Amino acid sequence: MSRTIKIVTLFALFAWLSPASAADAAKPATQIATFAAGCYWCVESDFDRVKGVLETTPGFMGGKTEKPTYEEVSSGATGHAEAVNVTYDPAVVSYKELLDAYWLNVDPLDGTGQFCDRGSQYRPAIFVYNDEQKKLAEDSKKAIEDSKKFKEPVVVEINAVSAFTPAPDPDFYKTNPIRYKFYRAGCGRDARLKQLWGDKGGH
């Protein structure tokens, strides 16, 4: 094969490979989803069980105060919700699958708190990062509404992300397992989730 033919062949090969390589390079290795469903201890625990989730970070989102403390958020005065940033591998688990997991771990009919925890800081919400997440979240909510599974309205908010403040007690369910189990059982979370979603709900 002549040198000219070799060069032409190599250029053709690179041209064929480049679009796929560029697409792979443009796709982020990890992505983030943010969910609120009451106490972030429980939400963190629930998503850590999902295959493809790499990290969960509990904190506060959706309020008006910059870098609020736990005590400020707990007062309900800042407008924040307890939320969890979920870092995941989209090659293993899709955003739609994370939404499916979210719905099975939230009371979608209670907009003033979740389970035994009351107040706007415990309100359920899906915080979206882009138009694709927004559409998928809205579609998932509409699917539940259209299913007529519940007589009451689905009140989970779908909001754009805002500043996120990490909480002071990450991995509480790991560092304080006995206290966490007593809290979760006493709050009636899993009992209510099974009432809403059957065996798929809760732990």
Residue map of PLM features:
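Flexible coil/turn and secondary-structure edge motifs
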Residues: 2, 21-203
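Bacterial N-terminal signal peptides
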Residues: 6-19
